[in-house]
Design a protein with these regions (language model features):
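Acidic/polar, glycine-enriched structural segments that form the non-catalytic walls/loops
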Residues: 1-135, 151-154, 161-168
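Charge-dense, low-complexity intrinsically disordered segments
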Residues: 52, 147, 194
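Solvent-exposed loop and edge beta-strand segments that line ligand/cofactor-binding
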Residues: 121-137, 186-199
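Well-ordered alpha-helical segments within folded domains of soluble proteins
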Residues: 132-145, 150-157, 198-200
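Helix-terminus loop motifs that line ligand-binding clefts
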Residues: 151-200
Length: 200
């Protein structure tokens, strides 16, 4: 397939044609087969047929989004109080949330237990240790969440608080300690404490 545009230009005139690539893959699946609807399905539906609507949203709003990102970044880049190495680090370290190891669910898609009012969020500790949301490591990357998406960070903290009094098929109920993690790449959100050494 291909895409073609037709425009008529005057001499020395230029035009910018925006392009958007979108896809609608509404379900994320853990290694054991548990499936979760992705968070964006709260806004675009769960059919898997909404890539056009997603692209349309982007085409209608990309200029505003770009401007808001520029404003946000310029507030840091142009601030002489921050050394250059810190500016670089602040933006480069955001990659971790967007490289494929992040879950933000919006409901169970395969019959597992789920609280429909709780959209859980978590990310891998790293690709060498496939644990989600490890309590002893997550604080290293929690600053972007606290500063940029405080409601997401609050949800993560709430999940740890809930783990003190509840279990997910992983340990005796109500043991009064915080879970170490929210599952592995195979059991994310369904079996906490994939690292079985001890609770935190």
């Amino acid at each position: 397939g291909g895409i073609a545009f037709k425009v008529t230009l005057s001499a020395n005139q230029t035009i910018t044609v925006p392009l958007v690539l979108s896809w609608d893959i509404p379900i994320a699946q853990a290694g054991t087969g548990y499936k979760w609807y992705r968070r964006y399905t709260r806004f675009f539906g769960r059919s898997g047929l909404n890539s056009w609507n997603i692209a349309n949203e982007a085409l209608n709003n990309y200029a505003t989004w770009e401007s808001e990102i520029d404003d946000w970044q310029n507030g840091i880049i142009n601030n002489s109080r921050y050394p250059d190495w810190l500016k670089t680090t602040m933006f480069n370290e955001l990659y971790y949330y967007f490289i494929g190891g992040t879950y933000w669910e919006a409901g169970a898609a395969s019959g597992q237990a789920d609280n429909p009012d709780e959209d859980m969020f978590s990310h891998l500790e790293c690709y060498d240790y496939l644990h989600y949301g490890t309590s002893d490591v997550r604080f290293y990357g929690s600053w972007p969440l606290i500063l940029l998406w405080p409601e997401i960070d609050k949800q993560c903290v709430k999940q740890f608080c809930d783990s003190v009094y509840h279990t997910r098929n992983d340990r005796p109920a109500a043991i009064g300690t915080c879970a170490h993690d929210f599952g592995s790449d195979k059991t994310v959100f369904t079996e906490w404490n994939s690292y079985t050494y001890r609770d935190s």
